[in-house]
UniProtKB/Swiss-Prot annotation:
Keywords: Repeat. This is Putative pentatricopeptide repeat-containing protein At1g28020. PPR repeats lie at residues 136-171, 172-206, 207-242, 243-273, 279-309, 314-348, 349-385, 468-504, 505-540. It comes from the Eukaryota. Transmembrane segments: none annotated. Belongs to the PPR family. P subfamily. GO terms for cellular component: mitochondrion. GO terms for molecular function: mRNA binding.
């Protein structure tokens, strides 16, 4: 334990730290010689997730001095381990106890923590309290990063960036990256390219983040020519490393541009770049895209990797591989994998047999589809109610709040059929008055366990005075996930919402736009966007923007895919 402590901090410092702290935090070699020291006590406290300030106070009470560098390391360690509140407390303690004269990087770190823990408004107040002579580029960059997280604070981000420009603080790529990230989210390509030109004029070298952000933007708008030109310029330059998310987006762009050969190269590169923590997500994406590229062998190869490294106890993997095999017209392969899934004791996922049945119907195999959906196995798994006997035994003794908590816990652990059983039992036994969120939760669970058709039937039986935005969002979410053409159904739901004076919210807007985009209903998509997309609090998700861009490309409106025309 004694000898391992310094290496913990050396490994931590080897990672790229936040802001300019990378030049401030240093670990003294004398730590290697100290036994039972303050750093060792702190390490022990960190391992136990204990409070750090009492350790520091005790060290001082014993007549010892606290090294400011050690405190900065502690703050960073806490922040990196998602203990922002305690990191903020240590930062405030360092200031209150006057451990040292604070430098701009100390203020920058604290500003970031305040925004993370308390919110942007308090962070702005703290910024105003920072002495002007301590407001260096690290402080302004921290404030800029806070503003650049949302399009609601676009004006403040631009004003802060201009202030940094006026003060001559735009000497590193970090502030440029913050603005590029914001403009990319808004699909404002012109602004991103203006910033690239400004960086070039000011001799500010692009870094890894810059290159990946720009490539993702060109991928999203499907400008393969500019994407390749930019990649060729930076590929192979020291310090520039492509992220697997970037190469995956580039592969998608190539597929939309019908360059399957180039897409395949990018997908193979993605496999080389993906890290261990992201394997599950990456394999899901890879199987899907290899399927879109029409490569059955690659789908099965990645599925083999998925099983060996992730395991077979996961519905998501089976959904992805079956969908991908159907995409490459391998109905036999899809059937074989379905039989394996059917034999496993996984939570029943109606989408898997429904997907295979749809594959049968698409190929004119209607009888086979009906036989599958009416098979004893599916009926048994749908009607399996192991929770019901327990509810009959002790359910009446539970408070309504306990039952709702049970539903939430079952839902969070993806035991959807059991969660639905509890929800149905509550309704049948009338153990309490049901509220809006109860109906929304049951609608969501019904769609996940029994399918969209049953969810629609349940929706029709919900009392009109209980159909608020959460209920409508649950139904629209089901439509957005469906492979069927449901644009007309969405139109009906929107009309009903209007009659009931229920305005679309952030989630509703994104779901509706995805449905319209999936069906290439350009006019309906643009009309809905013009009406609701600019309302306060409405922000398009990246997935929504990509879906809309794909719809434009599919409709031959390539220019619109790269501009906010609505």
């Amino acid at each position: 334990m004694v000898s391992s402590f310094p290496f913990v901090y050396q490994n931590m410092l080897a990672k790229r730290p936040y802001g300019a702290y990378q030049n401030v935090i240093t670990v003294s070699m004398s730590w290697l010689k100290i036994h039972g020291s303050c750093p060792h006590r702190i390490t022990d406290a960190l391992h136990r997730n204990a409070q750090i300030i009492p350790v520091l106070e005790q060290w001082r009470q014993q007549g010892n001095q606290v090294n400011p560098s050690h405190v900065r390391v502690i703050i960073k360690k806490l922040r990196d381990s998602d203990q922002s509140l305690q990191a903020l407390q240590v930062s405030e303690w360092m200031s209150k106890e006057k451990i040292c004269n604070l430098i701009p990087e100390d203020f920058a770190a604290r500003l970031h923590l305040i925004e993370n823990v308390v919110g942007l408004e308090e962070a702005e107040k703290f910024f105003e309290s920072i002495p002007k002579n301590a407001r260096g580029d690290s402080v302004y960059t921290s404030l800029l990063n806070s503003y650049a997280r949302s399009d609601k604070t676009l004006c403040k981000a631009e004003a802060t960036f201009q202030k940094m420009r006026d003060l001559g603080l735009l000497l590193r790529p970090v502030p440029y990256n913050a603005m590029m990230s914001l403009y990319s989210a808004l699909k404002n390509r012109e602004k991103v390219e203006e910033l690239l030109l400004e960086m070039k004029d000011n001799d500010v070298e692009a870094d890894n983040v810059t290159v990946n952000n720009v490539l993702k933007l060109y991928s999203a708008v499907c400008d393969v020519t500019e994407m390749e030109k930019f990649l060729n310029k930076w590929e192979g330059i020291h310090g520039i490393k492509l992220e697997w998310h970037t190469t995956l987006d580039m592969a998608k762009a190539y597929l939309r541009a019908r360059s399957s050969g180039k897409a395949m190269k990018m997908l193979r590169l993605t496999e080389q770049l993906v890290d261990q923590k992201s394997l599950k997500s990456a394999y899901d994406h890879l199987m899907k895209l290899y399927g879109e590229a029409g490569n059955r062998e690659e789908v099965l190869r990645v599925w083999k990797l998925y099983k060996s490294k992730i395991g077979e106890r996961d519905n998501n993997g089976y959904r992805t591989v079956i969908r991908s095999l159907l995409k490459v017209d391998d109905i036999v392969g899809a059937e074989e994998i379905y039989k394996v899934w059917e034999s496993l004791p996984l939570e029943f996922d109606h989408r898997i047999p429904t997907m295979l049945a749809s594959g049968y119907r698409d190929r004119g195999m209607t009888e086979k589809a009906e036989k599958l959906m009416n098979s004893k196995t599916i009926k048994d798994r749908r009607m399996n109610k192991p929770v019901t006997p327990l509810l009959e035994q002790w359910g009446d003794q539970m408070k309504p709040s306990d039952l709702k908590c049970l539903i939430k816990n079952l839902r969070d652990s993806k035991q959807f059929s059991k969660a639905l059983q509890v929800s149905e039992w509550m309704g049948e036994k009338q153990v309490c008055n049901l509220y809006l969120e109860d109906y929304a939760a049951r609608l969501y669970l019904t769609e996940n366990v029994l399918g969209l058709e049953e969810a629609e039937k349940y929706f029709e039986n919900i009392p009109e005075n209980m159909k608020d935005y959460s209920v409508y969002v649950a139904l629209l979410s089901s439509y957005a996930k469906s492979d069927k053409n449901l644009g007309n159904m969405v139109d009906e739901i929107l009309r009903e919402m209007e009659e009931n004076n229920v305005d679309p919210d952030l989630i509703t807007v994104n779901h509706v736009l995805k449905v319209y985009a999936a069906e290439s209903k350009i006019q309906a998509m643009e009309m809905f966007m013009r009406r609701w997309g600019t309302e306060d609090g409405i922000k398009l998700e990246r997935g929504t923007m990509i879906a809309m861009a794909k719809a434009y490309v599919k409709a031959g409106l390539t220019k619109k895919s790269g501009r906010g025309v609505w």
